[in-house]
C-alpha cells in the first residue's frame, strides 16, 4: 500500500516537473524571440524612420529614444561627417518629440540632451554652448548634466565659467553631490578631466553600495540561493546613472524597449524576476541582469509614470521563480510557499501582475501607516514639501480605482504622504549624504526659480530682451539690494532720463518679493534675469515711471585687468557712438565702483542669433533691411576709428524692428595714423573669423605672443558670413567639423566657397564681394552701402508715386467745386467710369471731362 502511494506521488511529482520545464522552455523561447526582434529593429542604421515612427506612435518615452540613439551611435564608429550629421539629426528629432516640461525630471531625457550637446560640440563648438545651457536649464537636478557643461567650458579654456557652473550645481542641489565635489576638486587641481576613469569607477561602486544598503534596510533581506554578484553589471548600472557614454547593450539594462511589450497580448514574468508593472503598460515586465542590483526608481513628469528597476536574486544554473499568492504584509515581501525543487534550483511560481481592489488598497494604506514609524527613515519636512511641489501637477492620480490594477511594489525608503499622493515617488539616486536644498538667490523672485525653464538659450549676452506680460502696478515699496554689501544711494536727486519705446507697463511681481537696484540714486525694480556670461548678468528692470530698461551688472571682485579694460572700453564706446547713430544700443546711465559696474541700457526684444535660430525662412525685404542696419552700425564705428573684430549675430539686438550693435568689450580703437591694428590675442569666432586674422596669428610674433592683424575689412568678412547665414541657413564653413581643417579651409585660396543660385543675383554678388580672402580685393563698407542690393529701386517707384499724386490732385480738383450731394455723386461716378476704362489723366481727358460736367 505504501509502495503504491509512493509511486503515485512520484508520478504526480514527475508530471508537475514536466509542466514546469515546459513553462521554462516557453519563456526562454519568448525572451529569445523578443530580443532578436528588438535587435533587428534597432540594428538598422541605414533607415530608422520605421523605428522612429513606432516610438513616436507608441510610448514616445525617453528610454526608447535613448536605446535607439545609443545603438545608432555604436554602429556609427568610426564617426564620419555624414554619420555625425545623421546622428545629430536623430538626436534633434528626439528632443523635439520629448517636451522638456514633461520629461525634465527623466534621466534618459537628460542623457539625450547632454549627448546632443556633445555631438554639436564636435561639429560646431560655437553653437554647442547653447545646447549645453538648454540641457542644464531643462534637467538641472542631474549632476552629470552640469559636469558635462563644465567640462565643455574647461575644454574651451573658460576655467572661471566651469567653476561657476559646478558651484551653481551644488547650490541647486544636483545629485549626486559627491560627483560635484570631486569635479570641483579636480578643477582646483587644474586637471584637464573633471572626472577620471578611476573616479568614475569609485563613484559607481559607492553609489551601488549605498543603494544596496538602502534597499536591504527598507525592503528587508532578499533571500537568494546564490548571492554572487556580477561587478560588471553593477558598474554598468551606476555608470548609466551619471551619464557616461556606454555601449547600447549595457544601456538597455533596465530600459526594456516598450515596442517589445506591445506585441504581446499577455506576458508572464520570467523565472527568477520580480514583477513590476509600469503605469503605462500593466502587462509589461522588467528584464534585468543576472546580478544583484539595487532598485532605482526614476521620477518622470509624464502622467504619473514611474519606471522601476527591481532586481531579484541571481540564478546559478536554472531559472528561479516565485508566486505572490496573497499580499498579507508590506513589511516582508518574500515567498512563503515553497514548491518542489529541481535538481539544480528550487522553483517558485510568480504571477505576472498584482491586482489590488479597493479593499486591498485600503488595507495596504493601513499597513503602511503602521509600519512607517519604525521602517522608514525620517525625511525633513522642507524636502518633502519641495518634492511634492515639483510633482504636484503631474503625479497625483485622480482615479485610484481605475489605477488599482497598476500598483507597483514601492521602495520603503522615504516617507510618503498617502493622503496627498497615490503614486509612490522615489529619488533617482539613493545617497546617504543629504544634498543641500536649493537656496534662492537674493537677486531672484523665489517664484521665478520654480518656473519651468524655457528651451531657449539663456547664456547669450543681451539674450531675448522680451517684454513681460504685466498686470499689477509697480509696488509702492520694495526691498532694495545692492550686491556685495554696497549701500544703495537714496538721497540723490533723481533726474529725468529718456524713455524707451516700452512705456507705461505694469509689473507682474509681488510687492514683497520683488527686489530693486539703485544706480546713482535711481530705483529700478528687477523683473527677471535675461542674460549672463562670465562675471556679468543682465536684468530686465522697471523704473518708477513704468519704463522698461536693461541693467547690466558686472562683478569686479575677481576681474583681471583685461576684463576691467574691456568694460571701461565698452562704456566709453557706447557714450561716444550713440550720439552719431541710432543703430548703436543706447546707454542711459552707469555707475562704476571698485566692486561692481551698473549699466542702464536700452531693452530690446531678441538678439539676431536667437531670431535666426527660430526663423525657418527669412523674408527678402526683412533680410535686406537688417543688412542695411548692420552696415550703418559698422560704418559708424569705422568712422570713429574702431574695429569691432568679433562680429557675429549675437552682437546685434532687434529693437522695434531695427538691428542695433551691442557688446564692444573686445573692440579696439585704431590710432589715427594707422590703417590696421594688432591685437594681443585672437578672440574672434571661428565661423566668422577673417583669413588675415588666422594667417597673422602664426606669422607675426612679438615678445613670445601671437599677434592678430585686423582692419575694417575684417569686419566686412564677418558681416559677409552673417549675411551668408541669413541667406543659406548656415555659415560658409559650418559643414567642416574639425576645427583645424576649418581654419585651413578659411585661409586656403584653393578651397572654393559655395554660392548656390538664388533669385536675388545682387545679393549673391554682395556675398562674393564680402567673402574674398584678399583684404585688398574685398569690398568696403561705403561700397556696400552704395551697392544696388541695399538700394530700393527708386526710379520706377518715384515715377509711379508722382503719377499717383497727380491723379489724386486732379480728382480732388474736380470735386472741390461741387456743393450738392447729387453733383458730387455724379462727378464721382464719371471719374470712376473714366479710370475704369484704363485711361490715365492727361490734358485731353481733362478737357473732355470738363465738357461732360458742363453739359450735365
From Swiss-Prot:
* Residue positions, PTM Phosphothreonine: 33, 360
Group of enzyme by EC: transferase
| Sequence ranges assigned to domain Protein kinase in this UniProt record | 524-790
> Which is one Pfam family of this protein?
Pkinase
**Which EC number(s) are documented for this chain?**
2.7.12.1
Q: Which positions does the record annotate as the modified residue Phosphoserine?
A: 7, 37, 80, 281, 317, 321, 363, 393, 435, 454, 820
Q: Which residues bind ATP?
A: 530-538, 552
Query: Which stretches does UniProt call biased (Low complexity)?
Result: 835-846
User: Coiled coil located at which positions?
Assistant: none
Q: Name the PROSITE patterns for this protein.
A: PROTEIN_KINASE_ATP, PROTEIN_KINASE_DOM, PROTEIN_KINASE_ST
Protein keywords: Acetylation, ATP-binding, Kinase, Nucleotide-binding, Phosphoprotein, Serine/threonine-protein kinase, Transferase, Tyrosine-protein kinase
Catalytic function, reaction form: L-seryl-[protein] + ATP = O-phospho-L-seryl-[protein] + ADP + H(+); L-threonyl-[protein] + ATP = O-phospho-L-threonyl-[protein] + ADP + H(+); L-tyrosyl-[protein] + ATP = O-phospho-L-tyrosyl-[protein] + ADP + H(+)
CC terms in the record's Gene Ontology section: kinetochore; nucleus
How, per the record, is this protein's activity regulated? Inhibited by the ATP-competitive kinase inhibitor, SP600125.
Annotated signal sequence is none
- According to the UniProt record, list the residues that bear N-acetylmethionine: 1
Which sites are catalytic?
646 (proton acceptor)
List the molecular function annotations (GO) for this entry.
ATP binding; protein serine kinase activity; protein serine/threonine kinase activity; protein serine/threonine/tyrosine kinase activity; protein tyrosine kinase activity
Location of the region described as Disordered in the Swiss-Prot/TrEMBL record:
369-392, 835-856
- GO annotation, biological process: meiotic spindle assembly checkpoint signaling; mitotic spindle assembly checkpoint signaling; nuclear chromosome segregation; protein localization to kinetochore
Kindly give the PANTHER family that the UniProt entry links to this protein: DUAL SPECIFICITY PROTEIN KINASE TTK (PTHR22974:SF21), MIXED LINEAGE PROTEIN KINASE (PTHR22974)
Give the record's subunit note.
Answer: Interacts with TPR; the interactions occurs in a microtubule-independent manner. Interacts with MAD1L1 and MAD2L1.
Q: What does this protein do?
A: Involved in mitotic spindle assembly checkpoint signaling, a process that delays anaphase until chromosomes are bioriented on the spindle, and in the repair of incorrect mitotic kinetochore-spindle microtubule attachments. Phosphorylates MAD1L1 to promote the mitotic spindle assembly checkpoint. Phosphorylates CDCA8/Borealin leading to enhanced AURKB activity at the kinetochore. Phosphorylates SKA3 at 'Ser-34' leading to dissociation of the SKA complex from microtubules and destabilization of microtubule-kinetochore attachments. Phosphorylates KNL1, KNTC1 and autophosphorylates.
Protein family membership: Belongs to the protein kinase superfamily. Ser/Thr protein kinase family.
Protein name as it appears in the record: Dual specificity protein kinase TTK
**What's the source species for this entry?**
Macaca fascicularis (Crab-eating macaque)
**Organismal lineage:** Eukaryota, Metazoa, Chordata, Craniata, Vertebrata
